[in-house]
Amino acid sequence: MTRPPLVRGIFSLGLSVAVLKGVEKTVRKHLERQGWIEPQKVDYELIFTIDRLKNLVDNKREALTAEQPDAGELSWRKVFNFISRQSSELDARIYVLILLLSFLLPIAWTVLDGDRETTLEDKDNDCNVDLIENERRLKHYNDGERAVLQFGKNRSEPIILSYKDMNVLEGEHEFTSKEEHSNSHLTSKSENALSQVGSEDLLGCHLEKQLEEDKNEPNGEADGEDDNNREKDCSSSSEVESQSKCRKESTAEPDSLSRDTRTTSSLKSSTSFPISFKGSIDLKSLNQPSSLLHIQVSPTKSSNLDAQVNTEQAYSQPFRY
């Protein structure tokens, strides 16, 4: 038993030999005439005479076709005759060249077309990769940078991607300094008002003692009344001076007083007393303003405790948390 590969090899070899023999038989006539297989003697005189006769026949044919009326017309029969005549006169080398070209041209076309498509695809891939990398560079921001781009205060302002302390701005710093100055001024005014109330309490106690002495000594009523009038005049003059000072301070700093109108009104109401005392002096009314005095240094600020913030808003510059 022979192996299958050996049978296949013998069959392919025999087929190739048969093809070569068939090609040799078909081309032998042309090859023998040209002298490729066996060199033979050539009679050049016979060749020249044959060429002359051929030229004469061609000239006669052209003259006859020119004399015919339908010589200018073209038909498929004439075309076929011309092609067959020219193909019969071709050399065998031209036949081989035509066969090779007919086999090689489609292969070369497909190879070149495939290379061109691969180059175009490579260029497209390179362009796509460059575009993707550029988009990644443009979109590669962290949370803080995206927050600056999304939640910027003003589009005309430049975008600052570096770190910047946004806890206290310049305008807020000026506002806080003004607020501290106004608070210090209000505390100084409240202290002055408290000192004035304390001095008036002492003055009221002194007046009460003098009234008791006047009741015990009926003989010195006239002297006591003169002393009371003098003390009333002194207290009224001191109150007028204090009120004039308060008015000057209020006109000197209208901004600080306009921010806290409630506190100033409460201070004025607590420190204001009647200029002239008529009749009996109520010591409880004198002592009452000191206990009801309400001092408010800064206004209350409302806070929203229900706010929910994500990471981009937490990193954003316009917000403070």
UniProtKB/Swiss-Prot annotation:
Origin: domain of life: Eukaryota
Record region (Disordered): 174-194, 210-275, 299-321
Compositional bias per record (Low complexity), positions renumbered to this chain: 263-272
First-listed, main subcellular location of the protein, grouped into a coarse class: nucleus
Signal peptide: 1-22
Region (OSH1-binding): 139-195
Topology class, membrane: Single-pass membrane protein
Compositional bias of kind Basic and acidic residues: 174-183, 242-262
Quaternary organization: Interacts with OSH1, TSC13 and VAC8.
Name the UniProt record assigns to this protein: Nucleus-vacuole junction protein 1
The organism's taxonomic lineage, starting at the top: Eukaryota, Fungi, Dikarya, Ascomycota, Saccharomycotina
